[in-house]
């Protein structure tokens, strides 16, 4: 499983619709649906209940989405911290070079 799939499932849950989520993610509805079905097969559990008129998140889906959101938050924070560190190292290096 990759980070993209976490984003996909979170968006599906927020939109309560694969078609709306696919539109926001710039994906085809069928492509997103196939990704979701593949994930559910791999997990061995349904994340969403669906029929022609309804699309509801399951209890397992709620757990998955809650944890996916936490993982995505940690990833964003980590990338920001690394970016800040990189910028500080560049500033320090530039500052030291200017002192010579």
Residue ranges and their predicted role:
Residues 42-43, 64-86:
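Alpha-helical linker/hinge and terminal dimerization helices associated
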Residues 86-92:
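Immediate post-signal peptide segment of exported/extracytoplasmic ligand-binding proteins
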Residues 93-100:
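Conserved small/polar residues in nucleotide/adenosyl-binding loops
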Residues 40-59, 79:
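A short LG(V/I)-centered, amphipathic sequence patch enriched
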Residues 2-5, 29, 61:
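The N-cap/first-turn positions of alpha helices
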